[in-house]
């Protein structure tokens, strides 16, 4: 995302490069110079390829910076120069490899006196190494011209960066022929002999360590190369030189002078251990011996190496008895005087490697020297040195696992001579391995019983005992080992058997850790017995969720008692259900007929016809007009639909209205009634109730709703359009009151004649009926279209009453019913107007949300 949107800041290097007098240091002061160089900025690369710039870069990494500079920025430019030269830009590599002047300036760094600056040496080694890998022919040709190159490498071998450069020269050259030429050239320069001469007590420790590591890496690299190139016609010259008997004798003679130097001895033993390596173990703890019949040099040890070591075995044995002088070591366990030391530890490692070769002559020499006895003494003496214990355990395991040796084989023999395993006999009979193990175990138990600390070698001792038991039972020398145990004195034999069956068995049992539990994995359905029954009754519907309803339709007997009582509740209503059902079906049929226009031949549902509005429709029309002067088309359509539904209802079907709602109902007739098809005034102010014929434009545009501006009141809820009778509570109501305080029910029945001729005769009159549960009072409502005023006139008549205690709603079906009342004249009485306004306001407030 960072690069996608180009949010990185632009580099200042391009701006600097546009200047003619820009210098290299100014560019190196920029923070992003390395990124620009690795991105191969064309201008920057061209600038760096200048001769003076490359010379400055090489100078920075080969010359010491001034001493008076701040330490924080002293090596800033050498570091940047090294990074720029090793950024792996092909143009820079080509220029450095082809320009001999730059190579000479770079090579001049080796001419400095030792010790070299370690940091500058690392810069020099890094630059020359990348040139060797990228331009091998040019660099090798240049180095061969220098007669003192190998001498300078040996001179500065104490610097680790120079040692790395030598190894790079051996490993970074990919062409096989060129690599072979380099090996031959270095062998001719006697680099192996010079490195061996460095492993001398007269040299310092750094030179010992680096020379030894260089020789070890040369051995490993040469053997790896032999594995990769099986058909190589020429052997590795450096490895062959190092395995020469004269070179090995020279190496051993250097370390066994009168003056014993621990660093030189350890370095020489490291080289011998590398020569004794056959093939690296496939995994830790695995001894990879040479397979039978395989004579590859990687799987065998050179005889010259074994012969040279065998001659110096007494000297190595003496090192175990008299190591180089070391100081007293204080540890948390106590004072070690003398400590084991690195020399004796490496000598035991060398003996373990010799035992792995299973050479008869070497085994005879070790028996004569009693080297294993000395090693066992050290094992029990230094009870807290785990490095020593590990090597002793390896030595004993190798002796027990190796087959019987044969005098005519100097390397690993595949013969198993049970009666000729001299080293195994020596271990049991001369070294008294069994007796020493039993004695040490008893001492440890006694010490622990007294509250003392357990010996540190007890873990390794347990493994040694298990190895002996395994060798007696299933080992390659089981016959000989079993016979050697039987040849023990009777007392020792009994103690051994008791120890194996009691102490050893208990220790192994205690040390054994079960990685996997014995309990088998089973289905979770078997665990149902582990779950207790809940203390509460569970819903049977949840228990039967997801099952087949036909199969599991029966409810459980443990259902909740409170839910069982639901069936006892009586939901019957005291209502005229037959009339309600008939009214509901009639309404549904009417709605289906109105909107079923798919090929029907019935009359158009939009055709004007005699309609009458229910109380709810009139209320919504009145209340909507009082709140605002605007109306939406959707509300107009809803009003028309309500009219269609009301026109189909029989005048004997009555709706029961709550008296509480009727008590708060009032009507307001001062606002013009803008309901469609009823008393709608034309937008130009003409009298729609007059007998004059309307204009043609109004006839064609009678259904245009764009000019209606009164929206419905937003405070109203969704109204119910169902014509079914509703049973409500019946409270005592004053039958003569027409305002809100009297709690009356008002039903407004309006009849609008849609025909043009009938409008002129009957348009000025509306009838509103005020009634309650016991009687009705009919008010004749007269509307003057010119003055837009409405006046009520009371007219008593005998009205039918409902048999129920609730109020009934009378619907005037057609215009004839409305014409039974004589028309009333408009009145200008202020008192009647106030009554009308109060009725309208109360009606709107009472019937707001339905």
Curated annotation (Swiss-Prot):
It comes from the Eukaryota. InterPro entries: ARM-type_fold, SAPS. Residues 627-638 have a biased composition (Acidic residues). Residues 610-652, 683-778, 793-850 are annotated as: Disordered. One of its GO terms (cellular component) is cytosol. GO terms for biological process: regulation of signal transduction. Residues 703-731, 764-778 have a biased composition (Polar residues). GO terms for molecular function: protein phosphatase binding; protein phosphatase regulator activity. Residues 826-839 have a biased composition (Low complexity). Regulatory subunit of protein phosphatase 6 (PP6). May function as a scaffolding PP6 subunit. PANTHER family: SERINE_THREONINE-PROTEIN PHOSPHATASE 6 REGULATORY SUBUNIT 3, SIT4 YEAST -ASSOCIATING PROTEIN-RELATED. Belongs to the SAPS family. This is Serine/threonine-protein phosphatase 6 regulatory subunit 3-B.
């Amino acid at each position: 995302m960072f690069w996608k949107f180009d949010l990185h800041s632009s580099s200042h290097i391009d701006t600097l490069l546009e200047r003619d007098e820009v210098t290299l240091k100014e560019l190196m002061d920029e923070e992003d110079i390395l990124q620009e160089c690795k991105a191969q900025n064309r201008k920057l690369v061209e600038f760096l390829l200048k001769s003076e710039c490359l010379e400055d870069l090489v100078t920075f990494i080969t010359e010491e910076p001034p001493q008076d500079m701040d330490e924080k920025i002293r090596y800033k430019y050498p570091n940047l120069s090294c990074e720029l030269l090793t950024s792996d830009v092909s143009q820079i590599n080509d220029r450095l490899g082809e320009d001999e002047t730059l190579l000479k300036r770079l090579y001049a760094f080796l001419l400095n006196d030792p010790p070299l600056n370690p940091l500058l040496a690392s810069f020099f080694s890094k630059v020359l190494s990348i040139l060797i890998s990228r331009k091998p022919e040019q660099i090798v040709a240049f180095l061969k011209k220098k007669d003192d190159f190998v001498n300078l490498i040996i001179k500065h071998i104490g610097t680790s960066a120079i040692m790395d450069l030598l190894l790079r020269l051996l490993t970074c050259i990919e062409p096989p022929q060129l690599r072979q030429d380099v090996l031959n050239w270095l062998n001719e320069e006697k680099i192996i002999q010079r490195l061996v001469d460095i492993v001398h007590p007269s040299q310092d420790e750094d030179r010992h360590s680096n020379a030894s590591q260089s020789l070890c890496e040369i051995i490993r690299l040469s053997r790896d190369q032999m594995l990769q190139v099986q058909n190589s016609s020429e052997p590795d010259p450096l490895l062959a030189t190092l395995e020469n008997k004269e070179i090995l004798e020279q190496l051993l003679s250097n370390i066994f002078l009168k003056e014993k130097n621990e660093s030189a001895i350890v370095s020489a033993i490291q080289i011998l251990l590398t020569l004794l390596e056959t093939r690296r173990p496939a995994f830790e703890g695995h001894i990879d011996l040479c397979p039978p019949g395989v004579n590859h040099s990687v799987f065998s040890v050179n005889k010259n190496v074994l012969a040279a070591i065998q001659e110096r075995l007494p000297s190595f044995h003496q090192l175990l008895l008299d190591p180089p002088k070391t100081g007293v070591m204080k540890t948390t366990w106590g004072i070690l005087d003398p400590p084991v030391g690195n020399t004796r530890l490496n000598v035991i490692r060398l003996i373990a490697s010799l035992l792995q070769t299973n050479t008869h002559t070497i085994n005879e020499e070790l028996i004569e020297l009693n080297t294993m006895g000395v090693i066992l003494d050290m094992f029990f003496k230094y009870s807290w040195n785990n490095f020593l214990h590990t090597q002793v355990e390896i030595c004993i395991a190798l002796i027990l696992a190796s087959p019987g040796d044969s005098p005519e084989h100097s390397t690993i023999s595949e013969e198993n001579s049970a009666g000729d395993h001299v080293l195994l006999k020596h271990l049991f009979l001369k070294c008294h391995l069994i007796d020493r193990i039993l004695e040490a175990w008893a001492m440890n138990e006694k010490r622990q019983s007294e509250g003392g600390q357990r010996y540190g070698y007890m873990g390794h001792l347990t493994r040694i005992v298990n190895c002996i038991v395994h060798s007696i039972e299933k080992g390659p020398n089981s016959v000989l080992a079993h016979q050697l145990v039987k040849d023990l004195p009777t007392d020792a034999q009994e103690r051994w058997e008791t120890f194996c069956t009691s102490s050893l068995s208990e220790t192994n049992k205690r040390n054994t850790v079960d990685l996997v539990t014995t309990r088998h994995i089973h289905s979770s359905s078997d665990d149902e017995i582990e779950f207790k029954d809940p203390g509460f009754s569970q819903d049977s519907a949840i228990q039967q969720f997801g099952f087949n309803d036909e199969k599991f339709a029966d409810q459980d007997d443990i259902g909740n008692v409170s839910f069982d009582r639901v069936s006892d509740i009586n939901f019957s209503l005291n209502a005229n259900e037959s009339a309600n059902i008939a009214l509901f079906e009639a309404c549904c049929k009417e709605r289906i007929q109105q909107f079923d226009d798919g090929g029907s031949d019935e009359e158009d549902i939009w055709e004007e016809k005699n309609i009458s509005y229910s109380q709810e429709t009139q209320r919504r029309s009145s209340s909507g007009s009082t709140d605002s002067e605007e109306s939406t088309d959707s509300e107009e359509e809803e009003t028309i639909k309500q009219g269609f539904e009301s026109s189909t209802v029989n005048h004997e079907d009555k709706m029961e209205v709550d008296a509480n709602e009727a008590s708060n109902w009032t009507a307001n007739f001062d606002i013009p009634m803008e309901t469609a098809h009823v008393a709608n005034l034309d937008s130009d102010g003409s009298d729609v109730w007059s007998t004059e014929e309307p204009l043609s434009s109004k006839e064609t545009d009678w259904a245009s709703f764009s000019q209606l501006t009164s929206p419905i009141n937003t405070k109203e809820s969704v109204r119910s359009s169902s014509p079914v009778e509703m049973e409500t509570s019946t409270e005592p109501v004053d039958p003569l009151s027409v305002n809100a305080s009297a709690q009356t029910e008002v039903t407004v029945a309006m009849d609008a004649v849609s025909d043009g001729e009938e409008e002129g005769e009957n348009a000025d009159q509306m009838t509103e009926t005020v009634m309650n549960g016991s009687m009705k009072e009919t008010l004749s409502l007269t509307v003057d279209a010119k003055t837009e005023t409405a006046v009520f006139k009371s007219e008593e008549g005998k009205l039918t009453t409902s048999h129920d205690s609730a109020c009934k709603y009378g619907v005037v079906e057609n215009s004839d019913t409305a014409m039974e009342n004589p028309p009333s004249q408009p009145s200008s009485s202020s008192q009647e107007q106030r009554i009308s306004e109060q009725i309208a306001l109360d009606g709107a407030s009472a019937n707001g949300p339905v």
